[in-house]
């Protein structure tokens, strides 16, 4: 950045800003051998394709369970907008998967609305093992579609309230193979419509080496909470009527100048006729910045 011209009559200056792109094409080679089995993967990844900001990944991998390749393309801001997209395709010896996402997030605290569309189709073989030996093999197929629109409700001081309205198509079924020995798991369809409330207490800091190396990150030290309540719907394909609950709470604490504690708790529940399933998970991540280029991280799940 340098001053290129000074205008004395109005006491202003013209500033020339020069930017350049770093070479971001990274090759990937991974090789290992254990117990007479050789695993390897090769590929390339570029986080700034031709200076466009788009990301591409090409991988080919082989291990003792499968062989396959992966192609992924992501655009974090399509044509300079606040929309972002991800397209990914994987073809493996035991199945294949497609994934597409189109999102306009709440890209700033004052954003009035958001939108998301997420589609996934996946087919894979599942193996059951006993004492290290494969004893059963069957196929699982997943069809997933989720979309929602979100609205900002209110902003009081540094507290932002939001409401998301959406639906999820979630259909999983199982198929026999020539090596299926045991009974298949039951097919399930948990398609639902839902409402989600979000609370964000804004206390953002620009930090370094927290979740990513050599990048400045906007980390929120305020509380973040969300509560989603869904109702399973037969007209969407659900097997049964029932309710879904998904609640999450997150917070980051700065213990001292170089030490941070990131906490996340989540509760999930599914209520069907005669069925009650609940899951609680918790994660703590302790980050201590050693230097400007390195951090020590400890994670407890």
Placement of each model-derived feature along the sequence:
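Short secondary-structure junctions
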Residues: 1, 80-81
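Periplasmic polypeptide-binding modules associated with outer-membrane biogenesis and secretion
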Residues: 1-33, 37, 43-46, 59-61, ...
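A generic structural micro-environment signature
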Residues: 9, 25, 37, 55, ...
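A broad, low-specificity signal for short, low-complexity segments enriched in glycine/proline
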Residues: 18-20, 33, 48, 64, ...
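Transmembrane beta-strand segments that form the barrel wall of outer-membrane beta-barrel proteins
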Residues: 24-33, 40-42, 46-48, 52-63, ...
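Secondary-structure transition/capping motifs at alpha-helix termini
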Residues: 50-51, 79-80, 255-257, 289-295
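Transmembrane beta-strand segments of outer-membrane beta-barrel domains in Gram-negative
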Residues: 90-285
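Active-site gating/interface segments in enzymes
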Residues: 281-285, 295-301
């Amino acid at each position: 950045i340098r001053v290129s011209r000074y205008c004395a009559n109005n006491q202003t200056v013209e500033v020339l800003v020069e930017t350049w792109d770093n070479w971001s094409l990274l090759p990937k080679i991974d090789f290992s051998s254990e117990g007479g089995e050789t695993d390897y993967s090769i590929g390339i990844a570029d986080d700034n394709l031709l200076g466009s900001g788009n990301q591409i990944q090409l991988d080919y991998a082989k291990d003792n369970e499968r062989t396959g390749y992966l192609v992924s393309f992501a655009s974090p801001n399509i044509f300079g907008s606040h929309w972002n997209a991800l397209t990914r395709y994987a073809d493996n010896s035991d199945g294949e998967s497609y994934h597409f996402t189109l999102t306009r997030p709440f890209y700033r605290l004052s954003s009035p609305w958001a939108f998301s569309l997420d589609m996934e189709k996946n087919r894979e073989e599942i193996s059951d093992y006993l004492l290290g030996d494969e004893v059963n093999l069957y196929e699982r197929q997943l069809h997933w579609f989720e979309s929602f629109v979100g609205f900002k409700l209110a902003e009081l001081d540094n507290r932002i309230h939001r409401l998301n309205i959406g639906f999820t198509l979630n259909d999983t079924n199982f198929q026999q193979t020539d090596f299926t020995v045991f009974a298949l798991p039951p097919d399930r369809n948990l398609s639902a419509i839902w409402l989600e409330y979000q609370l964000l207490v804004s206390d953002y800091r620009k930090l370094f080496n927290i979740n990513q190396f050599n990048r400045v990150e906007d980390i929120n030290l305020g509380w973040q909470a969300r509560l989603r309540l869904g109702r399973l719907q037969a007209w969407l394909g659900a097997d049964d009527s029932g309710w879904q609950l998904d609640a999450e709470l997150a917070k980051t604490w700065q213990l001292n100048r170089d030490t941070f504690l990131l906490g996340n708790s989540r509760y999930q529940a599914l209520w069907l006729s005669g069925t009650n399933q609940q899951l609680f998970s918790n994660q703590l991540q302790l980050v201590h910045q050693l230097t400007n280029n390195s951090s020590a991280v400890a994670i407890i799940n």
